[in-house]
Structures are given as structure tokens and as C-alpha cells.
Amino acid sequence: LKILPTITVFCWLICLQCYAFGQRYPLSRDTVPHKNNGLFRKIGEYRDSMRHKDYRQAFMKRITRQDVREPSNDNDSTIIKSEAYFTPFAGKVIRNIYYRKVKVFGPSNINDTAFTTSMQLVHLANRLHYDSREWVIRQSLFFREDQRLDPFEFADNERYLRNRPFIQDARIYVMNADATSDSLDIEVVTKDLYEYGAELSQFSEKDVRANVSNNDLFGAGQGLKVGMQWRSDFTPTWNTEARYTKYNVAGSFIDVSAGYTTLNNYMPLDTNVYEGTYFISLNRPLYRNSAKLVGGFTLANSWSINIRGAQPQEEDSLYRDYRYTVVDGWIGYNFINNYKHDGTIGHKPNFAILARHYNLSFQRKPGQTRFKDDPVYNNHRYYMLELQAYRIDYFKAHYFFGFGRTEDIPLGFNISATTGWESWKYRRRLYSGMEAQKFWLTKRQGLFNTTVGVSTFWLNNATEDAVMHARLEYYSRLVSFKKARFRQFLTIDYLNSPDPFFFKPLNINMDAGILGFRNTRLNGYQRLNMGSETVYYSPFKLLGFKFNFFTSLQASMITAKNDDLLRNPVYLGVGGGFRVRNENLALNTIKVSGYYYPNAPYPVKKLMLEITTIVDFRFDVSALRSPSFLSFK
């Protein structure tokens, strides 16, 4: 199939060569010459050309600047409303939709149409990549020809395309929008991620772990991932995984994934266990704000693997022999929507109702006596019902978590009230909870994200496993100095359970507290985490890989020694390093860092150097998600 474009390009080159030959060697003397074009003849030709619609529209477009592209703000700190570009064209009829693909290894800015390169390696890499097929992009559009332009719909569509796993960036442009006409043309521009990916997460003489993936197989909006691990002290020594994903099945906006793994990387039930899993999942997110139905379904069957070769029948054995099935489904209905077709949004919130059913059932439980009363190894079922009010607008910006790519930021509020019923270890409890989240901009273009939540379970008119959670995040304005850019990040997170029953105590290890803390025995039911990070977005680039340098300060307190949180020591971590990523590639970010812990608890050392990979973090732009209990981890 790849040879057909090559033949086409070859034919075009022959035609261009013939044209160039004709220009260089004009007609010979014995050929009948053309008549000279006088002034009156040129005026007549100009009059005739103005009668042609195509030429007339092109002429008017040049003098009225109708096809001016959305201004690029890649190097600016401005946060721009997503629908602002489309609002002046609200209500106009869509005549034609055109599609344009920007090469993966092309311009870093999708608006750049003048990019050229003579590097043969770049051309080879682009030829090896299957561009997303036009029908895949067309299936992902919310609009069609002969419909009227809705600014919110177009902004949602652009954001949906940009958040597809196989697309790096996307833009929707208005074309031929004559001020005197009620119709216009649309151009959809997309830039793919390079489809091939690979990761070597572990490599030593006794342990090798790697995977390869393709996030847009044959350009058909589908992904495939295959992984393996060989470890000499495991039984069996070889373990594998495979996952297939089809995005937006038949234009339904449902993503379907299916696969298996014996690498213990699909939500293991407990710590110090090793599991294998078969699974299938379907997910239909709130892909646009006017979507009525959202939901998802997961079916998984997991089992323990005796990876260390322990004796399962021994009472003191670390191996737990079990097998269980999870059935998890949720659905939501967006029944009040206040986004207007003219590109404006009122002060009234939108309303949605959501429901969820979760059932974890064991086919085989561990034989050890000490696990019989552990709630983790008992059947667990719950039903949830949630009412949600939200008013969210979306903005576009750069240089938050990325290396220059367009990032979508939700601004507004989300309030949810949840109730439910749970059956776990022969206890049937009612649940109630409330959670509120708000994003807002400061006058200096800083961004706040606040979250507050309270919840509890009810049994015999008494509360248990109550949770109180508060979180504050601050992102400063992007500060630019020549080609350098800086941004400051601040976080404060407080979590407490005053009456735990099933809950296990908190810790401050890794993401739960301080990066670099592992296997500490600091546990409690109240925790306060604080963090500060300064990021320098370097202009330095090597073979497409960009560098972000950072310094960080982490602080954590936990009620491990005293029930009064403020009477416990403050554990600190000071560090810095850099992150490296090529945003054209479907690879995780490489992080190189070093940390110093002045009062490190046992068994943490005072100094740590680390090279690891981290996943690409993005703002959660979906207003509606699966109902869940307030997390206590």
C-alpha cells in the first residue's frame, strides 16, 4: 500500500519537470505565435476573471483577510477561551469540510505552514508513520456539512481531537467566511503522535522488562501494546501482557479495550501480591458538553500467581491463593445544559445524574486464617447515585505540564452530592458524601484549583469511615525572560478519617507524601502534605527532545507519633533535576532527579539519585466521571 503514494509523487514530478522544460524552452519560431496582449485586452481579462466565483472569493479574501488563522500564543502566557475564535461565526452554515495533516516530524507549531527540512532521517521517519486516516478524523467530528456553526461544539471538538491518544495537536479553522454570506468552509488540521513506542523499564542480568506499542495501528484509530518480563527468580520466569484498544467505535464515541496481563499491573487487590488478569472495558466520556449520555463498563477476572514458589497451604506463607471477578458499570444523563449556540454561557449551572454498580466476588479465597477476616479478601458490592451541578468553560494555554504542546484547562466549578449502599464483609452500610471543586484565574493569569470533600458511612445511626479532604493547587503565570520561561507550582493537601473501621492507615511514601520515601513505617489517619516546585522550560532542544529543569521542596506530616497532627515532626525533601520528552513520540517522559532528606526516617537514606520514566500528566477536562467514594489513600 505504501508504494501507491510513491508512484503518485513520481508522476507529479514528471509533470512538473515537463512544465519546467516548457518554461525554459519556449515555442520555436516555426510555431504560430500568440498575439500580443495590449492594455485593453488585459482589462477585459480582469473583468472576466472577476465574474468567476472562485477568483472573486479569493480576491475578496485577500483584501478582507477572511482566512486569518487563530493567533498562535505558544510563547505567550495568555490563557485564551477555547470558543472565542468561533464566536464571530456563530449560526453560519457549513458548506464544505476540508482536512489537512501536519507531518509528525514537521513544525513544532501546528500553525506553521512554511516549515521545510532537508534531513533525510526526518523524511524516512515520516514515511514509516501511517497518518490517521481521513475517515477516522471525520468520525470524530461533532458537525457535518449543511449544519450551523456552534462555537461551544467546535471548541469541544477541537479539545476532543487533541486528547485522543494518537493525536498531538488539532485545530479547526474557518475559511471563506464572506461577511455578506451566511455560509463558510471549515478546515480540520491534525498532527499525529508518532505511532510506534517502546519502553525498557528494567534491565539487568537477572531482570528484563520491556514493551512495544502502536497507538494508531494502520492509521485506523486503534492501539496495540505487547509487553514482557523475564526475571530469573520468578516462577514462571517469563510473563507477558497484550492490550488492544479501538477508539471511537463506529463513531459512537465509545472506546473499547481488551487484553490480558501476567505482569501484576492491572489494579492488584493488595500489596505484596502478584496477579494476572483478563479484562474488557468500554468507556463513553463526556466528549462534549452537550452530550446527553455518558458511561462505562468493565469486566475483569484476576487470579494470584505464586511467583516466588511459596507453599500455599502453610499458615505463615506469604503467598495468597485466590481468584475473583469484578463487574463495574456506570451511566450518566446530562439533563440540563446551559451552553448556548451563539457561543455564550450563562450563570446557571448544568445538571446531571449518575449511577454506578460495582461487584467484586471471590471464586477462591486465601486459605490462611489471618486473611479470613481481612475485608480485602471478602466480597464487596455497592450501588451509588450522584447528582452533579457544574459550570465549566475551557481555555487553551501552554507550558503547564507539557513541553510546549497545547494544553486544555477547565475553569469553573463542579459540585456533587452522592448517596449509596454498600455490602462488605457482612456489613451493610449507607453512604453519603459531598464534594466541590473550583478552578479560577487570578488577575495576573495565575490559576487556582481547590477541592473540598466530606463523606461518611452510616450503620445503626452511627458514622464510620468518615473522610475529610481539602486540597489547594496554585499555578503561577508563565514568566518569560528572552527565550526562557518559568512557572511556579504550589500544593497543599489535607486528609483525615476520624472514625476508621475498614480503612487502613495512611503513609507518606512516594506519591502519598514525599518522593523517595519507601517502606517507611510512619502510619496514621491524618496527613498534611505540602509541596513547591519551580519549573524552567528550557529553549534547549536535542533531536526534538526538549528539557524542563525543576527544583522542588516537599513537606509532610502524619499522626504516626501523636494524634495531634501539629505535634508530629515535619519530614522534608529537597531536590531538583530535569525532565526530557519528545512530544512527537508516544514515549513516557524521562526524569533525572536528586533529593536530600534532612530528617529521613528508617529505612530511607539521606541522599537519593534516580532516573525513571513518568507518564504524561494532563488536566482532567471531563466534567462527568464515574461516581466513587471519597478516596482515603
Model-inferred region functions:
Residues L1-T8:
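Bacterial N-terminal signal peptides that target proteins for export
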Residues A20-T463, Y474-K633:
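Immediate N-terminus of the mature polypeptide
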Residues C15-Q17:
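N-terminal signal peptide c-region/cleavage motif recognized by signal peptidases
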Residues V467-M468:
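Amphipathic hydrophobic-ligand
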